[in-house]
Amino acid sequence: MLPNLLLIFFLQTPTVLDGTFSGAQAARGKALYTTHCGSCHGESLEGVSAPSLADARFIERWRESTLDGLYSFVRERMPFGRSPNSASISDREYLDIVTYMLQKNGYPAGRVEMTADSVGKVMFVGKNGPQPVPDGSLVVTIGCLSQRDGTWVVSNSTEPVRTRSETASAAEVKAAAEKRLGTLTFRLADLDAAPGFTPEMHQGHKMQVKGYLVRQPNSERINLSSIEMVSAPCVR
């Protein structure tokens, strides 16, 4: 079952199920995709020398993240091995290609085109709607640092959400101070990933944790990439 706070967040956020691009935009994207992407990813996105862009694995990789993550990846890295002499692709054309990819994955078109402003406000979700982030995702959560049976954990943690950076910015930590705590507990692994961090000095503090989520029955953990104090003591 989707946690209540996460459900409220997604109910307030447009998703790719809501018709966030137009049919005309996807049609333009199809022509651009055929020219620039089809030779590697296949005419029907089935994958040839490069991975498929229209299957469950593709959706699993990108779901529960804002769509600008996929857009930025395509814009900055594709076509792979592009020659400096090859024809340039504009940001708008990259957006069109992404909308075609969405259409081929069965997501509905709407009446309004996707723009550079809107792409970061749309959540990429699976066909069954919002779900907890998948195993192995780089995530961020906020919780209380404590020790249980000799293991460091963050308790009263928020539902983890995807993040793109392994490190925390000052703005993120400041924003975390305003966020309410949750009900989850995660074991922390790889504390040495935070040089100079001494957990004993932050026991009972509200912390922002980033790392790779490992889902295990009754014992979920986060392989740490960064940990920052939000406030002391840890209060809701």
Residue ranges and their predicted role:
Residues 12-32, 127-135:
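Electrostatic cytochrome c docking/interface patches
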Residues 29-43, 97, 101:
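The canonical Cys-X-X-Cys-His
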Residues 48, 54-109, 162-166:
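Extracytoplasmic electron-transfer domains, predominantly the class I c-type cytochrome c fold
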Residues 83-148, 229-236:
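Flexible coil segments in periplasmic/lumen-exposed cytochrome c-class electron-transfer proteins
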Residues 143, 204-217:
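Flexible glycine-rich surface loops and low-complexity tracts that mediate binding to linear polymers
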Residues 148-159:
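Short aromatic-glycine-enriched beta-strand elements
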Residues 181-183, 193-209:
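Short nucleic-acid-contacting surface segments enriched for D/E, G, S/T with interspersed K/R
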